[in-house]
Structures are given as C-alpha cells and as structure tokens.
Amino acid sequence: MKKKPFVTLEKLQEITAKYPTPFHLYDEKGIRENARALKDAFAWNKGFKEFFAVKATPNPYLIKILQEYGCGCDCSSMTELMLSKAIGCKEGDIMFSSNDTPEEEFRYADEIGGIINLDDITHIESVEKAVGGIPKTISCRYNPGGLFKISNDIMDNPGDAKYGMTTEQIFEAFRILKAKGAEEFGIHAFLASNTVTNEYYPMLAKVMFELAVKLQKETGAHIKFINLSGGIGIAYSPDQTPNDIKAIGEGVRKVYEEVLVPEGMGDVAIYTELGRFMMGPYGCLVTKAIHEKHTHKEYVGVDACAVNLMRPAMYGAYHHITVMGKEDQPCDHMYDVTGSLCENNDKFAIDRYLPKVDMGDLLVIHDTGAHGFAMGYNYNGKLKSAEILLHEDGSFEMIRRAETPKDYFATFDCFPIYERLLEDNK
C-alpha cells in the first residue's frame, strides 16, 4: 500500500511560510474519522469507553477532539492527571494505570475522580494509606506470564514484562479489596504492543473474559468493566495492511457473547486505552533538507533530529519518508537521512531509497502522531519543536509553540547565572 501524506506540498509551503521547520503536523479530519470508526466498532457494548493514552500525544487540543466522541484519558503520572483535569475530565473519565507509583499520585487520582488500576498487589496498602481507604470502584492489572501467541506467531512476552499481577495474585487482590469495601471491579491487561493483526484484541478478550468469569465466581466480586488496554498497532511500513477496527470490534463481540453473556455478565463494559491507533497515522514530522554529505555513504541532513522523533534511534523503528513534490519520481537514490545530534544513531532512515533530494526540499516523516513529540528530550541542548493542527477546512493553527532557550534554562531561574544565560536571548 502506497503511503500518501495527508497534506499537500502547496499547503505545507503555506504553513512553513508562517511556522519554521521542523514541526509536528496533525490531521484533524483523520483524527475525527478514526474516533468515529472506533466508536461505531464497539457500539454493540452499551458501556464502551475509550481512554486515550495521554502518554502517546499529551496535547490538550488534540485530546479535546477525542472528548467530543466520548473518550476519556488513560494517565500514568501526576502531570498527565493534571492535564486531564484541566481539559474537563470528570469522575469516571480518567483511568490511572501506573507502576511504582508515589502515594501522592494515588491520592490526586482519587481526588479528581480517576479510576485507579493497581499494577501490583502490594499497592493495595499504598492506596489505602494514600486515600484513607479503598475506593468503591477499583481495577487490577493482569499478567498471565509466558508468551502471548496468535497461531504460531509470538506477539510478545508478558512473562518478561514488569507490569501486572500473576493469576494467583489477582484472585487474592480481589478478595482483599472486596473485604476492604470495594464494590465494583475492573480487570486490565496489556499483553502485546503495536500488533498489526485483527486477531489480537479478540484473543486478548477471550483471555480476559474467561478470567472475569472465574474471578466473579470464586471471589464474589462484581466485574463492572474489562479494560483491553492498547496494543492495536498501525501500519508504519507500506507493505503492511492496516488493522480493520470494524473487524476487531466484531471479533470482540463474538467472544463477549460466547463467554460473558451465558454467565449472566452481559452488562460488563468494555474499555480500551488506545494511543498509537488513535493518533499515530494522523501526525507527521515536517523537516527540511539542509545539508548533503558524500563520503563512504550518501547522507541527507535535515533540520529535525532524534529530539523531535526518537523512535528510529531508540528502537530502529521504520518511519516512511516522502520527499514532497517528488512523490511520482523514481526512488533511485540511496540515503541515510540524519539529524544533527552528536550520536551516530541519530538517523531517521538508513540505506533508504528516495527520489533525489535537493537542499530545501520538504520531507514528511510519516506516522509520528503518537510517541513522536511525546518522547522528545533535550540532549545536546536541542529544543523541542512546535505542534501544528491542520483543520478540516484547510486552515491551520499552532497548538504548542516551539521551545526557546528560556525554556531550556528555566530550571536555573533561582540562580544568579540565569540572567547571564539569557543575555543573548532577550
């Protein structure tokens, strides 16, 4: 499948005339269409709710779009909780799934009406101490261990993951929580990441639904919801077939009716915590070719770097690249596309065949809408870029400004050197 940018060269030239590269650009039209598709795919479940994984794209202007489609927020830190509260999340709109959690974060999550999802059985005591008791509604994260397989393919290795409780622990946790006053329970699991198959969610659902039946029978706990978390991936590479969310929703429905309904559990709500699927394809990193180097290899240097998109450097992840205006030209030049960090892994592409790149060309790096800007950092003193939203009507606006040296040096503002640091930036 050929990957096409959601923005034209002409529109990009209009945007770059106002906002300098590099920047992350988001597609409002795509975000809305995808949110509607998810909602429709699970419309069969009366209590369905998506809790957007804030960690993927922590921008309030983008999350507020998702709120229009009934989405809540999946948070894992104090600042994510603060952001969610600020955009109007109410009781029941926040799922707090964290690990190694400070007590003050449990306390704040409870204060703002978040549902606490316990990562470990020892956290029961921490929550009880932090909030002065056990919340009436609470969730536990499950890790069955071993390998998670679909057919003969290993999807991931839950047994090697730091998250969640064992089977024995989650049964014990439910008994303890029920004895301490919890009235409504949820179970949660994340067993594989970025799966590009329509089978993952139905397979996970079967595991979770069967667990829910046993938990309710053996502990007497009322299971209110089952959180399938994230894991639905996106097609980063042109040779991958995107997931079909309608088929995924239908697959989960079939398992729901096979496992839960006969046990009198047809009122259990399905929750999801999708991040990558909700935003990934609807963001791109726009950068400009500013240098070329001809040594042992052919290099194209761009004005973005791993600070703007860490995934290729950190994971060796593939992100498709389009040289704007040259989409129909032959990809007959092999390049390493590099940033300016003092690290040799600061490469967006290695040995990538592209059309001939001329200096000043605009390059679109695809599928950066999740875990793109969010994973940015300041190594080498680099500053994080702006975020721009392309509206459905073709207009655009900045939804986060680029960092400045003042931002970078802000934590020195209580020291005498602060003013000297900013002498040339006033």
Describe each model-derived feature in a short phrase:
Residues 133-147:
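Glycine-rich, aromatic-flanked loop segments that form ligand/cofactor-binding clefts
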Residues 260, 265-426:
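Charged (often Lys/Glu-rich) extended helix/loop segments that serve as interaction or gating elements
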Residues 58-61, 102, 147-148, 193-197, ...:
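Flexible loop/turn segments at secondary-structure boundaries
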Residues 144-291:
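Active-site loop/helix belt of alpha/beta enzymes
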Residues 1-136, 171, 177-179, 183, ...:
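A charged N-terminal "starter" segment
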Residues 72, 95, 115-117, 139-141, ...:
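Structured core elements
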Residues 31, 55, 77, 109, ...:
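Conserved, mostly hydrophobic/aromatic
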